[in-house]
Structures are given as structure tokens and as C-alpha cells.
Amino acid sequence: MAMICAQAPLAFADQSQQENTGNVRHFHLHGSGTTNPSKLIWLAMDKLEEMAGSTLRMTYRSVGSGTGASDWASANAGDFASTDYGLAADSSAPFMQLPFQIGAVSLFHNVPGVGTGVMKLSACTVAKIFTGAITNWNDAAIAADSGLSLPSQTIKVIWRSNGSSSTYGLKGYMYAGCQAVYSTAPTPSDGADPFSGNHLYSTGVTGSDSMRLAIGANEYSIGYIDAGHGHLDNLSEVSLKNANNEWVVTKEGDPAGRLTANIPAVVTSTVKATFPQNSGATNYAGDWSGVNLFNKAGAGVWPICAFTYLHVRTTYTDTATTGVVRAFVEYMLSPAIQDKITEFYFYPLDSAFAAEVKTAVSTTLSAASPVWTWVDPYILSYNTGIAMGYTTFSPKRQTYAEYERGLFKKNIAALEASVAALKTELAAKTGNDDAADERTLALAAVSFVVAVIAVIVGSIAMCRGGRSSQVMRVVGM
């Protein structure tokens, strides 16, 4: 029993070996890599474990693209990896490189009174700022781009000190958009202090959270981060000029009259022609190290985009592992997960492209045995042997923890609606009705206390439900 419940070590571990004999069926899947999709991957793994007809244990180490790539290059280190950039092919151990989501890197600033989209910066102006050629917000180049008269304040340049896909994306944009200023081709391995120059003020931070906090805490600063997380903190986004000479932002609603970019539209037929090819078709087992989505042409295209990849072997020593890997990747490319990506501040693939990648996976991993089967929850008449089979995923299989999470989300939504209504009521009060104000404040206080209690109770119930479901699975075995 202890062997069943223990977590398998992942770093530099061999490929998983499945137990699939007689009535003993225990399946495993382990990977590591970039932090960006970690929450999405964990969600997908939770759902698959829940829906599986057999004991299924899946883990993902959120360690960064660099460590994930190093793990992957170390013989049979785990079953899959994930990075925010393509890797070189390995003829001795062939593997597929499978895009499954798109990230958009944005520039955010903290110039008081200048909101999202108001400030426009071309690639050359951005390059001059980050190389120290421009050090003051009242520089003529900034005024020419934006039409703004900004105060004479030192630009506080904030950059990632530990190497990141965001730095790679920004340098790729500057290189693709203005080689007259920035002529060094970027590489994913660019590490600490990636921008040299005569900055009057610059500082490095580690991680996306540190970046967003640093921008928010320092007036007259500028930095870069994946777009969704910047918007989460209501940071002011810079409007960038794309290859079609459009001033675009990633923020929804065309703020300041700027065009909201269509992120998935970056994958045009022209871009797909730059993918590795084999007999006129995309070679997902080819060399993807030269593929990028920087400053690509197209209407409404955002100029700093990047794929997030899943890397999986073309063959595994255990065909049952092939089956689990195939099922996991197919699920990541299915509408069930693609539709969730925006909740984690990234962007899904175009549905046709996602289907193409999914077909490539299914074809390449056709040696899977067993092949996991998906049961459609809306079919009233189905083969019971399939639905109750060991290697099936059925949405009808759920846990109490999942049920509690659903209630928890509904309660939070109701609370948010109540708070919004209270804000509207308070905003509408223009007189000196102290009694009404006191009633409203009292109601708000009661609502807040009830909400806190609901959150605490919901969290406890959710955790207890999760533990209970795990115990029930072990007992059931």
C-alpha cells in the first residue's frame, strides 16, 4: 500500500513503468518544466485522475523551462517535459515538440496618469530604453511615438535577472523589429543581466510575481511580463506597434482606442511554413529551436508571442506508458482544456491548429497499448463494458472534492455580485442620509464576515473531500 501512495521521484528518473497485469492496474505519468502552464497542467491531471477507471497518478514539477529542458536531455528523465521555446532535435532519442498554448509578453509601465494603451512605443524606442540609449521619460522619441508630454523623470528599467522566456520574447521583438538598435540575435539561454547599457536606474528581479510587484511599487518604471498577470494587477500596458504598423494592446475592450490583439491569429500559414517540414507536412519531431512568434505579420497580431510546448518521446519502452502519454496530450489539446487556458491568463490555439497537433500525436503514438477510451457523458445508450472499463475516462466519475469546488465557485460568484451591488448603492448616494449609510455599511460588514466564514468552511470541506476521495481510491483497490 505504501508503494501505491508514495510519490515517484521525478528529477532524472527513468520513464514510468506501468502495472497492467490481471486485476492489478496502476498507471503513472511524470514530467517537469516551465512554470507558466503549471496550474493548467495540474488541473488537467486532477481531472484525468478523477475520470480514470484505474488508479492513475500524474505529477508535474514546476521548475522552469531551463531545468525542464535539462531534465529532458538527461537520458530517460521522466515521461514528458514542457518549455516556452522549441528545442533542437535529438536523433538518438527522438521526441515530438507539441505547441498547446500561446503566451503574450507585454510591457507595463508606472507613469502616473497614463493608462493602458495611452503610451505608444515602437520597437526601436523600446530597444533604446532597454539598452540605456533613452533614460528619461521626456525623451523626444517617446513623445514622437505617443504624442505625450511626459515629465522629466528617470526611467526605471526592471528586467528578469534569472533568465526567462519573457526576456527571450522581448529581445526577440527588439531584434526582429529594430536591428538598427538591437542587433544581437536572442537565445533562450540568455541569463542574468540581459540588457547592458548606460541606464541611470535598472534592477533585476526573479520571477513574474517579483516583476509585477516591482512595476507596481516603483513610479516611472517599465518592465515586461506575460500579459494576463500584468492585467491581473491592473498595471498600465504599453501599446506596441506590430509588423502591420498597427498600435495594439492585449487588454480587452480596445482601451484608449487601441486595437485589442488577436493572440491565436499569430499562427498564420506563413508562420506555419517556418515550422520543421517533412514531405510538405509539419514535422513535430524536427528541430524547433529556430521557431519563434516575434513581430510576425498579420492584422491584429501581437508582436511578442511564444508557444508553450509539450515534449514527448516518439517511442516509449512500455507501450502502456505510450497510452498514458497519448491520453494526456490529447486531453491538453481538447476543447475541455483549451477552453480553460484563458482562465490562467494565456491563450488557446486556434481550434483547427489544435486538432492538427492532436492528430499528429495520435498517429505517432499509435503503438499505445492499451489505448485509453473517452466516454461521452451525453450518450444515454453506451456499452457498459467500455464505460466501466479499466482504461476509460468518464466525466461521470467525480469526487466529492470536485462537487465542493463547484459550490465554492458559485458562492464566490454570488459574493462578488453582492459586493458589486453594494458598491453601486453607495455610489448612488448623494445626500446626507446617515441612517441609510449606516445600514449599508452594516450590511456590507455582515456580508464580509459571512463571506470569510464561507471561504474558510468551503476550503476545509474541499480539503477534506480531496483526502476522502484519495482514501476511498486506496481502499477500493
Task: Name these PLM-found stretches.
Residues 466-477:
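Intrinsically disordered cytoplasmic terminal tails of membrane proteins
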Residues 435-468:
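Single-pass membrane-anchoring alpha-helices
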Residues 3-17:
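N-terminal signal peptide
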Residues 18, 420, 449, 470-471:
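Serine/proline-rich low-complexity intrinsically disordered segments, especially terminal tails, linkers
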Residues 14-426, 432:
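Flexible loop/hinge segments at secondary-structure junctions
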